[in-house]
Structure formats: C-alpha cells, structure tokens
A protein has these predicted regions:
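Q-loop/switch helix immediately C-terminal to the Walker
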Residues: 60, 65-82
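ABC ATPase C-loop
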Residues: 127-128
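Helix-to-loop junction immediately C-terminal to a conserved catalytic motif
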Residues: 27
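Catalytic Walker B motif of ABC-type/P-loop ATPase nucleotide-binding domains
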Residues: 135-139
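Conserved ABC transporter NBD signature motif
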Residues: 34-44, 50
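Topological signature of polytopic alpha-helical transporters
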Residues: 1, 14, 38, 93, ...
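Conserved ABC ATPase signature
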Residues: 110-114
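Conserved ABC ATPase "signature" region
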Residues: 89-106
Length: 247
C-alpha cells in the first residue's frame, strides 16, 4: 500500500479480518513481515525517531477522569514532545491544541465531567500535541449520536487536509462515507487468515464490490457462517489480478 499525505482513509472488515493486526503493524506495536515507511523512515528500524509522528487513539478513552482537561493534555505533551522544548513552548502548544478541539473553555474542568463528545476530543488532543503526520483512530465515533459523530469526522477530515494521513475504523461508515477519500477492505480467506481485498477510492470500491454501502460490502466478504455471502476468496484473487495488471 502507498497512502499519500492529505488523505482520509476508511479501514473496514469483519470481525477477525485483521484490522487490529494491520493497525499494530503500521504503528510499530507488532512487527509484520513487511517494510513500513513513514516519511521515508522505516518504522521498525527507526521506531524511536518516528513513534511520536504516529498518533493512535484507541476505542476506549485512555484518559484520567480525576484530573482536569488542561493537565491531562499537558502531561501528554510532556511525554510526546522533545525534552528540548521549554515549558513556555509546551504550554503554547497545549493552548493551540485545546483551541483546535474546542476544549479551551473547559480546560479547568475535570475530565470525568465532560460529555461523551468532549472526552473523545480530549483523547484525540492528547495524541495531537506532537503534530503527528499519521493519525489512526479506532471507532472515534463510538457512543456518539449522528450529529456529534459527523462533527467529529468533519474535524478529522479537516486535519487530513493539513497534509496528514488519517486512518479511521468505524462500525457506522455509511453515515460519514462522503468524508473519506479512500477505503482499505480486509477479510478472512478460507484459511481464516486476514487478507487485503481492496484499497482505492471509495467510488472505486463501490464499483469493485458492486455495492453502494460499506456495510453491504462487509456482508459480501464475511464468511457464510457469520451471516455473510462468503465471497472473500474470489474477490481477493480478483483484486490481486487487478493489481498485477490483469483483468
């Protein structure tokens, strides 16, 4: 895969398709039998140099509920920013991030008192302090209603337009599909091994799978015992032939 900067990418696949393994591989948490390059640097060989250029927000909020908003983001900045940065610079960066995510007005509030949407933005802000070029989010819209979910995804879309790669896993992709540039589709083959079924533009994915909705695409590739159509293997072959220049 070659993902250009400035793209917002949807990652979809059924349960056990390899989404978590894929994310762990590109973030350097697990070493895959592959070369992962970020800005020309090998993630595995130069992990200490690139680890803070990768932002990862897990599905569960990894935040301290018994501390205030600013202190939580400031502590994240202390971990993610170079030690050469002064306290003054660090506080200026935190101010900018709090503004960016609409948290400045509640910076003195306890995190536990925030709304669900604010907690999501707090989690994202903690990773954003190091201004990563690769931003990965696992179900950032989980637990949010349609309006709040769209507002959050629109914000992530704007972040991608700043020249960053934003990769998002969501179980409700169709309500925000227009915000994504590309889609990565993973599926289990007959041996129950996670495989790449498709990577490309959203509209190309619709044509490839002959489906208009991502939820329908996942059903196509899921195994029959999981309520799917069990077409993963033939589509894996089809995509491989396309990548190799054969019809």
């Amino acid at each position: 895969l070659n993902i250009p900067k400035g793209r917002m990418v949807l990652l979809v696949g059924g349960s056990g398709a390899g989404k978590t393994t894929f994310i762990n591989a590109i973030t350097g948490f697990e070493k895959a039998d592959a070369k992962i390059l970020l800005d020309g640097k090998d993630v595995y060989k130069s992990f200490e140099d690139v680890k803070y250029d990768i932002g990862f927000v897990p599905q569960m909020d990894m935040i301290r509920y018994n501390d205030n908003v600013r202190k939580t983001v400031l502590d994240a900045a202390s971990l993610r920013l170079p030690i050469s940065i002064s306290d003054k610079e660090k506080n200026e960066i935190v101010d900018g991030v709090l503004d960016e995510f609409g948290l400045k007005a509640v910076e003195d509030n306890m995190v536990g008192k925030l709304s669900g949407g604010q907690k999501k933005r707090e989690s994202i802000a903690m990773e954003f302090v190091s201004n990563p070029s690769l931003f990965i989010l696992d179900e950032p819209d989980s637990g949010l209603d349609g309006v709040l979910a769209r507002e959050l995804m629109e914000h992530l879309h704007r972040i991608s337009r700043e020249g960053k790669i934003v990769i998002v896993i969501t179980h409700s992709p169709d309500r925000v599909l227009d915000l994504f540039d590309d889609v990565i589709v993973l599926a289990k083959d007959a041996d129950r091994t996670g495989r790449l079924v498709f990577y490309g533009l959203v509209e190309e994915a619709k044509a490839f799978f002959d489906r208009d909705r991502m939820e329908e695409i996942v059903k196509v590739i899921n195994q029959k015992e999981e309520g799917g159509l069990g077409m993963a293997d033939e589509l894996i072959v089809k995509y491989g032939e396309i990548r190799n220049g054969r019809k």
